[in-house]
């Protein structure tokens, strides 16, 4: 599991812009774009072959190639009036979310708008990949850099969603727009990145606590932030992942479990299966739903596409809810509500019990530390309650009804692409056009 989902980084087929576009005054812009795009293609191929997208990989060459190409393609897109399109542009890309196999076919996309959007899309995913690679590094500034790149990736996606090329695509018949490039998918990606940026705060606070001497004792908070703020931050992150899942069309029934044992009174919460299937003492009260059945449910949604992304969002929600209960427990302990602290810490442990992360994952150590912290907290709280307080321990479902509203603490970073050509033309008009606009005469 990574700090954000990136799927398979897109790859693309050759495309000669100089054979499709001409200009009396700005032919050099087209030639520069051609050369830069060729480097993008080579770097994407190289990244795929060498595992550059892995946590220990190096995605920076891909990012640099994309940053070299974007000013040229942006100049052409923003100043179509000074370029002549001699033939229809057909650009072929292997889509990142639907192409779960490295051998999946590339999808032909008609028009310069699709080329531009795929470049921006790929750039956002590459930035998110770089953020994940920073998380995997054992360096003090890793969280700062990871947060910066996640925020920038979200800024790129938000720019993509507002730009004229995307509006052109959105006005095309739905059948001609791949699911990866739909408005709902891009909106979901923005929400996912927003949630990921807030999760980084929670991971950073836990990491700083460990630097101060290991798993904190019962009364210790993380990173010097108030438990109230971290609680609401975790809820906000969790809600962002929930919104992303809803935008991708995952049915509510797939995100929530209502059993005869526990019936949720609020549609706001989606606790893990084990929270509902265990008693407060930890003993099972109903047969748990198997991971196979859970995966089968996910794989049957969204017409067989985007399943890996939905699965990632489900796990991300689970970890976020673990943080919610953790900081709920700390807040309760600070307020001398020892029984509530015991119940919340135990709910967090159950929430994270099924979260299995490979050792090579960037989040293996942070989540392992989180689990260790929760076990120690629960033991400390329970010892205090058994010896001194003797307070009743609320169930996870009762605690869930007490969640406050989430709080956004990181704003979106505004991003705009550079251009290599500025003619001062008015490009503010967003009148709908078809995606092949300017493709041929």
Swiss-Prot record:
CDD domains hit by this protein: BRO1_UmRIM23-like
Region (Disordered) location: 278-304, 414-441
InterPro entries, sorted: BRO1_dom (IPR004328), BRO1_sf (IPR038499), pH-resp_palC (IPR037505)
GO CC, alphabetical: plasma membrane
PROSITE patterns named among the record's database cross-references: BRO1 (PS51180)
Source organism superkingdom: Eukaryota
Domain BRO1: 3-352
One annotated GO biological process: cellular response to pH
SMART domains documented for this protein: BRO1 (SM01041)
Listed Pfam families: BRO1
Entry's family note: Belongs to the palC family.
Function: Required for the proteolytic cleavage of the transcription factor RIM101 in response to alkaline ambient pH.
Name the UniProt record assigns to this protein: pH-response regulator protein palC
């Amino acid at each position: 599991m990574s700090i954000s989902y990136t799927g398979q980084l897109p790859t693309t087929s050759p495309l000669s812009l100089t054979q499709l576009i001409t200009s009396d005054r700005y032919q050099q812009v087209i030639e520069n774009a051609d050369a830069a795009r060729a480097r993008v293609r080579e770097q994407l191929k190289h990244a795929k072959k060498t595992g550059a997208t892995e946590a220990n990989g190096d995605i920076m060459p891909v990012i640099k190639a994309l940053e070299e190409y974007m000013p040229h393609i942006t100049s052409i897109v923003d100043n179509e009036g000074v370029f002549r399109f001699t033939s229809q542009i057909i650009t072929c890309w292997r889509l990142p979310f639907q192409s779960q196999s490295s051998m999946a076919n590339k999808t032909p996309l008609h028009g310069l708008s699709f080329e531009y959007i795929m470049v921006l899309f790929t750039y956002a995913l590459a930035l998110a990949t770089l953020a994940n690679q920073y998380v995997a590094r054992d360096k003090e500034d890793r969280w700062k850099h990871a947060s910066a790149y996640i925020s920038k990736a979200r800024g790129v996606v938000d720019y993509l969603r507002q730009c004229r090329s995307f509006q052109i695509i959105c006005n095309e018949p739905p059948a001609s727009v791949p699911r990866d490039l739909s408005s709902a998918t891009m909106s979901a990606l923005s929400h996912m990145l927003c949630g990921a940026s807030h999760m980084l705060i929670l991971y950073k606070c836990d990491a700083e606590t460990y630097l101060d001497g290991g798993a904190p004792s019962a009364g210790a908070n993380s990173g010097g932030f108030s438990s109230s703020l971290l609680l609401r931050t975790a809820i906000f992150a969790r809600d962002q992942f929930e919104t992303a899942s809803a935008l991708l069309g995952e049915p509510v029934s797939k995100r929530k479990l209502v059993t005869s044992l526990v019936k949720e009174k609020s549609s706001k919460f989606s606790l893990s299966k084990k929270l509902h299937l265990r008693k407060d003492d930890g003993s099972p009260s109903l047969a748990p739903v198997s991971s196979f059945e859970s995966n089968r449910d996910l794989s049957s949604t969204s017409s067989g596409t985007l399943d890996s992304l939905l699965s990632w969002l489900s796990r991300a929600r689970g970890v976020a809810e673990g943080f919610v209960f953790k900081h709920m427990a700390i807040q309760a302990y600070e307020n001398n509500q020892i029984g509530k602290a015991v119940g919340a810490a135990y709910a967090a442990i159950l929430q994270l019990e099924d979260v299995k992360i490979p050792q090579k994952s960037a989040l293996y150590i942070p989540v392992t530390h989180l689990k260790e912290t929760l076990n120690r907290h629960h033991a400390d709280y329970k010892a205090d309650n058994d010896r001194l307080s003797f307070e009743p321990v609320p169930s996870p479902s009762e605690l869930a009804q007490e969640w406050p509203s989430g709080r956004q603490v990181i704003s979106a970073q505004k991003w705009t692409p550079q251009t290599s050509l500025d003619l001062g033309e008015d490009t503010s008009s967003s009148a709908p056009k078809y995606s092949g606009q300017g493709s041929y005469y």
